[in-house]
Curated annotation (Swiss-Prot):
Gene3D superfamilies xrefs: YVTN repeat-like/Quinoprotein amine dehydrogenase
Protein family according to the UniProt entry: Belongs to the WD repeat L(2)GL family.
Any Pfam family the entry gives: LLGL
Localization: Cytoplasm
Keywords on record: Cell cycle, Cell division, Cytoplasm, Exocytosis, Phosphoprotein, Repeat, WD repeat
WD repeat ranges, renumbered to this chain: 36-69, 76-117, 132-169, 193-227, 233-268, 282-324, 332-366, 388-464, 508-583, 592-653, 713-769, 778-830, 835-888, 902-925
The protein's name: LLGL scribble cell polarity complex component 2
SMART domains tied to this protein: WD40 (SM00320)
Biological role: Part of a complex with GPSM2/LGN, PRKCI/aPKC and PARD6B/Par-6, which may ensure the correct organization and orientation of bipolar spindles for normal cell division. This complex plays roles in the initial phase of the establishment of epithelial cell polarity.
Cellular component aspect of the GO annotation: cortical actin cytoskeleton; plasma membrane
Amino acid sequence: MRRFLRPGHDPVRERLKRDLFQFNKTVEHGFPHQPSALGYSPSLRILAIGTRSGAIKLYGAPGVEFMGLHRENNAVTQIHLLPGQCQLVTLLDDNSLHLWSLKVKGGASELQEDESFTLRGPPGAAPSATQITVVLPHSSCELLYLGTESGNVFVVQLPAFRALEDRTISSDAVLQRLPEEARHRRVFEMVEALQEHPRDPNQILIGYSRGLVVIWDLQGSRVLYHFLSSQQLENIWWQRDGRLLVSCHSDGSYCQWPMSSEAQQPEPLRSLVPYGPFPCKAITKILWLTTRQGLPFTIFQGGMPRASYGDRHCTSVIHDGQQTAFDFTSRVIDFTVLTEADPAAAFDDPYALVVLAEEELVVIDLQTAGWPPVQLPYLASLHCSAITCSHHVSNIPLKLWERIIAAGSRQNAHFSTMEWPIDGGTSLTPAPPQRDLLLTGHEDGTVRFWDASGVCLRLLYKLSTVRVFLTDTDPNENLSAHGEDEWPPLRKVGSFDPYSDDPRLGIQKIFLCKYSGYLAVAGTAGQVLVLELNDEAAEQAVEQVEADLLQDQEGYRWKGHERLAAHSGPVRFEPGFQPFVLVQCQPPAVVTSLALHSEWRLVAFGTSHGFGLFDHQQRRQVFVKCTLHPSDQLALEGPLSRVKSLKKSLRQSFRRMRRSRVSSRKRRPAGPPGEVQEGSVKAERPGLQNMELAPVQRKIEARSVEDSFTGFVRTLYFADTYLRDSSRHCPSLWAGTNGGTIYAFSLRVPPAERRMDETVRAEQAKEIQLMHRAPVVGILVLDGHSVPLPEPLEVAHDLSKSPDMPGSHQLLVVSEEQFKVFTLPKVSAKLKLKLTALEGSRVRRVSVAHFGSRRAEDYGEHHLAVLTNLGDIQVVSLPLLKPQVRYSCIRREDVSGIASCVFTKYGQGFYLISPSEFERFSLSTKWLVEPRCLVDSAETKNHRPGNGAGPKKAPSRVRNSGTQSDGEEKQPGLVMERALLSDERVLKEIQSTLEGDRGSRNWRSHRAAVGCSLGNGGE
């Protein structure tokens, strides 16, 4: 009975916990997954994007962002922002309409759904009778005109969504008002286009799919003009002055129609097939925009020659003799053009083209010669190459920050200098208190550096490791280059490139030292690169060293992929991070753990075969250690051929079933232990009903060495601690494996004045075997004050107190199943905490975080942030290992999201909710990136962006986020993750990137290795 009862709560501690811990999902970084609709408000200067999962996202100035999620999770097919209002209407693929509003609450705007409506037909009518194809918000903001597949146009009153049946424009009524010769030439079919007259709100244009276009007088209920085309109509555009119509058609042509009072049925002024004369694909949308200079812009989507370029996704711009077909690597969803916002203006004067593709957003500067792209301050295509790992570094020194930005600015010379043109709303969030970096490794061998200081994720710099290796492609190849006489005049735009030249280039581990500027990256084929930040371009040879992890083993044969061939001579590297040494592991298996100690100039690396230590100052190998067990034969087969035998799979399955039956016999059969005990306590002692029950700890069973790859190196950790005796501390390297083994090596690092003359020596000092053989996921040493040891060079830069070396040190080992504290140097067990409460729970990520109090500026505590395979996040105290709070963060079915999670040094975190989006969350009350912004409908912006130094960075972007404290449930409907993760395709797409072979399934995504992260860089 006693073991189920937890001692009474300490009210002081509970109050302090409320000051330290609070769970929030704050913002989603990146590009919306599977976009399906685009909208724009010229008056508010707000862009809207809808997705197939039912989410809508609004973007304005950097830091201004809103998100909403339809309850039905149906695809958004159209978005229309009401003119001059903070309202928008969405159409879903289930034929429902939804009205959303931006309302001010507490001094900030929030996006809320006000009404929903489904158009109903008369009893017995076919579904096509009311299937909406086009939505036209009237300029009065009081009416919606709805074109349907039946050819009828229905009218709905806003904001109540009340159908006005007496105002319906039926196809029969239109037919009766047409001249006799036009009545029999066309079958109406569906409505393809609805447009309001730019100057007269009493006239609307109705375009039918078979080619008939009519101008309808709303007051007189009559046809003013009608136009007949011989081709199927796709879309239509009404010139700003109302004197010209431009229609586009299914054969790749467009026609210009004059609006003349002399003829009720005008003939086309001009009909043109821009990419003819051969058969072309349909032009699905066209804009004809006037300018003060007199020459219009013609911008259209599609129309490419069907035979040769039918697979291209293009949006074309024609102006003043210049024609360019912007070629995208993913399907174009829609586009819009930013023009003069005042509807009474005489000219459109377009200045920017905004194209929404399936995998990215591209903005083109139409004011600058050559029409260069504009750099995005948000909506970055994180998955331009698939993300394979992530690494977060907090509190970057200003000097390093400026050097990274300077290196990145040289890569952005091809971008326009135009200020970001979508600048509606006002961000109310203060500037971030520090500079943070999020580094993402990619399948194509690149590492991207993102400004993660606020909620507006911005690309600073891109590093490519491809130049080091011999590949089939030329790294200097310019994909956007084309000949002057080439036709069609294609130009590649955008950054999305889903194809990798060689999967072995993929980055698996990243470790950045923010004080020295050293960077270590490791890849899929056993390559470990050490790089140094250089402000100037350099041509240099990369020194190559081979690390044979099987040198003492016989009878093993690697069956996986080959190593990457590297350049033997000098290679030119641009300013930025430049590699100077390549350590090639043999066999060339995936690097599973990485650690860098820039003060000692050492880098440690681990694979499924063992680990090694390399001195990157003297360019020599210190030692290698093979960790293979005789049963680890599969570790030599490689990720492409690693398949477990059916016999072994069945044997292990039956073994688990037997264990489950045995353990179930030992428990009471009436349900979970906590529930059973709670019922018995209430029955026996009513007075104890309000006492809290301690969770039942699951029994930890010893694992067989055949259960997993026991030699798989999960984590590496450097520490200056007491390893041999309590009188003298020394540098050390710790390694934890998948079989529950911890290796400790004492290191002799020469002093700085003799560093190049004497060699680093290593000697194995200890080997610890955990009884339950669970994989070791984290190692940490605590000083005499039970505080984690500081980062390398952190004390030298006066950013941390010197560790307490005279006191007794403690070793914390975190396995998948328990936390255990040992005393040093004797390594005797002192404390332990088993992972509790739920059967099958395993530690997946663990990191040390500093939690500051929101009330007392000078008070803070170090704790462990722990993510389990069930998606729960727990905070565990140091050094007493007492659970503090637990939150439900990621769905347990989202294996890929759990695998991609990284923690920060101050209690925040990131994980992938789709291949292109990170969800950001916070566990801290103090370090909370809280986005707030304001959009005012009365504030109509008519200014045009000028050319400056590029987009100005704002500190944050806004999303309404729900707060979840311990024990509370998440607010429904606001998190896009719920919609995305209900789609199995999304989960499989992330999982295919982040989960490789069986041996690296749980560890290929690099966790945050900053500050006191356990295993500093390893898994």
